[in-house]
């Protein structure tokens, strides 16, 4: 069976990146929550 983690930088950025988050109201809420919580990183590193 194929593993669930098949690294792909572009896919990662498109689904979890900052601009992807900013596009939707829900994504903006995620960023707001993470800012309020004081997270160092608002979005995951896109390092593949």
UniProtKB/Swiss-Prot annotation:
Gene designation: rpmH
Gene Ontology annotations for the cellular component aspect, listed alphabetically: ribonucleoprotein complex; ribosome
Region (Disordered): 1-48
Subunit and interaction comment: Part of the 50S ribosomal subunit.
Molecular function terms from GO: structural constituent of ribosome
Pfam families, per the entry: Ribosomal_L34
HAMAP family associated with the record: Ribosomal_bL34 (MF_00391)
Family recorded in the similarity comment: Belongs to the bacterial ribosomal protein bL34 family.
Annotated Basic residues bias: 1-22, 30-42
Gene Ontology terms describing biological process: translation
The protein, known as: Large ribosomal subunit protein bL34
Keywords: Ribonucleoprotein, Ribosomal protein
Gene3D superfamilies for the chain: 1.10.287.3980
Miscellaneous note of the record: The open reading frame (ORF) for this protein is entirely within the ORF for the RNase P protein (RnaP). The two start codons are separated by four nucleotides.
InterPro entries linked: Ribosomal_bL34, Ribosomal_bL34_CS
